[in-house]
Amino acid sequence: YIKSELESIENDMSEPRQAPFGRADKAACWLLRARLYLNAEVYTGQPRWNDAITYAGKVLDPSNGYGLCGNYEQLFMADNDENPDAKKEIILSIRQDGVQAKSYGGSYFLIAATQKSDMPNRGTNDPWECIRTRKALVDKFFANSEDIPFTEYTDNKWQNVRDVQAAAKDERALFYTTGRKAELESVGKFTDGLSFMKWSNLRSDGQPAHDAKIPDTDIPFFRLAEAYLIRAEAYLRAGGANAQQNAWLDIKALRDR
């Protein structure tokens, strides 16, 4: 029934990037169908790899106006609903606002729960000291724990995060390591496990957010990057001529952002 409902509403939806930000357009419909087809074999026993390729391709059509954000970190900052580079990658967002849409869930949870008072400022004055990373995630960026920099800075604590990104050669390695251990040995000790800095209530333009506690940061529910990943997997699973090359080109587009 999900497929039939998506088919029935498509023509009533706005063209790509023509809906108000935060409302679903046709690209959101196509991306959800691509997700559905990627997992069709699980649901129905019948693979639909080519349909997944087709609908991911519809989302990725350059004429739609969507594109990859050149700065990964800005996708998860307070002005991701205003910053043109971030907005162009976000197909559908869960809207957040520190004044108009206060909630103890959403991006507030993602920022406050990963924050401690000794960490770099991330735009909230309410650190909860709950969530940090397991080493399995860190291992995706550092095959050898000895390569992780544990630098300390008194004034510019964000420089530690930049050191980690530089050592990992990956801007997604948004970890804070000062005073931390890579191994999560004690669940009740916040400094066991690296702190995760992906989400913040800071703005890319340096201006203040609406509220010092509750974030403005929208949650990118559907992003263009997902369409690349769906199509790459579908290419490989479908097989055939140039399958590996086509999949690699989609992954390379993400790696080269």
What are these regions (language model features)?
Residues N246-R257:
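Acidic/histidine-enriched alpha-helical segments
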Residues D139-L224:
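Flexible, polar/acidic helix-loop-strand segments at domain edges
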Residues L110-V138:
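Short, cationic low-complexity segments
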Residues A232:
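Active-site-proximal region of nucleotide-activated glycan assembly enzymes
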Residues Y66-F76, P120-G123, C130-R132, Y153-Q159:
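Short amphipathic alpha-helical surface micro-motifs
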Residues Y1-S117, G188-K189, L194, G206-L224, ...:
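Structured, solvent-exposed acidic/aromatic patches
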